[in-house]
């Protein structure tokens, strides 16, 4: 991955999602109510969505801009469209 994102910011978000996943595993091991587990699953889903947004924003701000400035507009836009399509399928 190019240096198009703030790795430290992304790492913090990823660690938060990992913590939430570990909490889900613990809840399952402790037979927590399904409703509470689902709340945590939704929190992880939201965290992963925010991670994806950070990556997309960085890609747009840096990689797409650089590609267009370098004269590779068509390929750059096609790559961004593909990335956006993949991200939108995650929800």
Stretches with model-predicted labels:
Residues 1-91:
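Solvent-exposed interaction patches of small proteins and small membrane subunits
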């Amino acid at each position: 991955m190019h240096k198009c994102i703030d790795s430290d910011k992304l790492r913090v978000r990823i660690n938060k999602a990992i913590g939430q996943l570990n909490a889900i595993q613990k809840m399952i091991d402790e037979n927590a109510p399904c409703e509470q587990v689902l709340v945590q699953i939704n929190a992880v889903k939201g965290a992963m969505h925010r991670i994806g947004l950070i990556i997309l924003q960085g890609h747009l701000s840096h990689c797409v801009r650089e590609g267009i400035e370098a004269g590779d507009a068509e390929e750059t836009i096609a790559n961004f469209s593909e990335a956006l399509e993949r991200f939108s399928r995650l929800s």
